[in-house]
């Protein structure tokens, strides 16, 4: 699917059933039985197969074979690892934990932002506040130097609280503000007259959609002993990733499916607590 069409994808006709099993959360666009159709199994093509591997040795257990010089991922392993990862995610959220979602792939920026807006709009604030996210650029030291970074996040949220609506209404554009907004908008928000910092110093788990581009984040998480869930393609190194999900992490359909699955988990938890 062309990246220009990503912005057209929205959450539509999502079936909500609070009694569903949290390991098999289904929607009307569930692709759990259609991974091949979604391109989840497609790995990377090696330029010189005789000289370089098109798959990383740490992904050998998820490797099904090679066809037309392209590695093929075992989708049964994908489904197994996905169930395990979302079970861990559900248990952490159900016990009041915090989750950090990271997807810095620029092609998925619009899709990721729209997904979070949908989740925020359709869930209680208390439930959504357990989620923090980064979809633009991971700033090194955000976790290990949280004391300093949190001051910048607070200043951004405070400015948004005072001037955000005014700037938007009068079409006033600050280049620096827009750049900071892309980096920090998922770390804090305004609830009434109070400021809520959704990013805690130490999240209980980090969900990374493109771990290959966020190696520094994985190092920070390992240093702080934070478990990491990662969508790993066949060329990814799984070292430092606690719960790898072997897949094609550039698949639009699979990425959208993960966001829908996350929404179903959060809705299940919010319904359970009522």
UniProtKB/Swiss-Prot annotation:
<keyword id="KW-0687">Ribonucleoprotein</keyword>
<protein>
    <recommendedName>
        <fullName>Small ribosomal subunit protein uS2m</fullName>
    </recommendedName>
</protein>
<dbReference type="GO" id="GO:0005763">
    <property type="term" value="C:mitochondrial small ribosomal subunit"/>
</dbReference>
<dbReference type="Pfam" id="PF00318">
    <property type="entry name" value="Ribosomal_S2"/>
</dbReference>
<dbReference type="GO" id="GO:0006412">
    <property type="term" value="P:translation"/>
</dbReference>
<dbReference type="InterPro" id="IPR023591">
    <property type="entry name" value="Ribosomal_uS2_flav_dom_sf"/>
</dbReference>
<dbReference type="GO" id="GO:0003735">
    <property type="term" value="F:structural constituent of ribosome"/>
</dbReference>
<dbReference type="InterPro" id="IPR001865">
    <property type="entry name" value="Ribosomal_uS2"/>
</dbReference>
<keyword id="KW-0689">Ribosomal protein</keyword>
<dbReference type="InterPro" id="IPR018130">
    <property type="entry name" value="Ribosomal_uS2_CS"/>
</dbReference>
<comment type="similarity">
    <text>Belongs to the universal ribosomal protein uS2 family.</text>
</comment>
<dbReference type="InterPro" id="IPR005706">
    <property type="entry name" value="Ribosomal_uS2_bac/mit/plastid"/>
</dbReference>
<keyword id="KW-0496">Mitochondrion</keyword>
